[in-house]
A protein has these predicted regions:
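His/Asp/Glu-rich metal-coordinating catalytic cores
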Residues: 1-15, 20-24, 29-212, 218-227
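Extended, well-ordered alpha-helical scaffold/bundle regions in very large, multi-domain proteins
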Residues: 232-233
């Protein structure tokens, strides 16, 4: 992760599909490596990155301090963070917030359009319309795609046209069954655990999944689905 196989200074633009750190997390490294161009993302993605990239930088710096304390005692080499808070702050200044379905001219002959991917607040599929020799062709990069009928998030939308599609395939090797009733399922687990006097631990991604869990907890509480435990949650 420390060495990039290309020169960031040679990049003209960055197009970001969404804020999850496995997609956005190396942007400060690009800036630290010399990238000075604009970073295009939806408005919601930009706002989330204002939180997540600074948090990621803080974690990088904290880990470096911890490792260097150990290295100093053992005579090991100095550990340098992947990037710093200052790098993240510089990167955030290069973001350009964009709206869904409004084409943006990047340069002569190239425009970009963001379409709601239904994966996370602000997530998008990206369409690049490239005109050369009087012929326009459209390349669509799907980004991470969400399912339909999820709470809190819009359904994914299809780009209007495409000559070429580059698509993610996280669940491409399986068929999903009928969507479970998450409220009923979670209520049963909570009820059984509380009745035994136990505690419930639910590991969850901080951005996206945790908000859905809070939404389910709210439904369970408002509908008073947990019996005999008045202090839930």
């Amino acid at each position: 992760n420390c060495t990039l196989p290309f020169a960031p200074s040679q990049i003209d633009y960055v197009l970001l599909t969404h804020a999850h750190i496995d997609h956005s997390g190396k942007i400060p490294s690009l800036v630290a490596g010399g990238f000075r161009g604009k970073i295009y993302a939806t408005e919601a993605t930009t706002k989330l990155c204002n939180i997540m990239l600074l948090d990621s930088a803080h974690i990088q710096e904290s880990e470096a301090k911890w490792r260097n304390r150990r290295a100093k005692r053992s005579g090991g080499e100095e550990y340098i963070p992947l990037y710093t808070t200052e790098d993240a702050e510089h990167a955030l200044k290069q973001f350009v917030p964009c709206s869904y379905e409004k084409p943006i001219d990047l340069c002569k002959g190239v425009s970009v359009t963001f379409t709601d991917a239904g994966h996370l607040l602000g997530s998008s599929s990206i369409s690049l319309a490239i005109t050369e020799g009087g012929i326009t062709e459209t390349i669509v990069f799907s980004g991470d795609l969400g399912n339909c009928d999820r709470p809190l998030i819009n359904n994914p939308q299809n780009p209007k046209e495409a000559d070429y599609v580059i698509i993610e395939s996280t669940y491409g090797n399986r068929l999903h069954g009928e969507r479970p009733d998450y409220v009923t399922q979670l209520t049963r687990i909570l009820q059984e655990t509380f009745d035994r006097g136990g505690n419930v631990i639910i590991p969850s991604f901080a951005i996206g999944r945790t908000q859905e869990l809070l939404y389910l907890f709210r439904i369970i509480k408002e509908q008073k689905l947990i019996q005999g435990h008045e202090n839930f949650p």
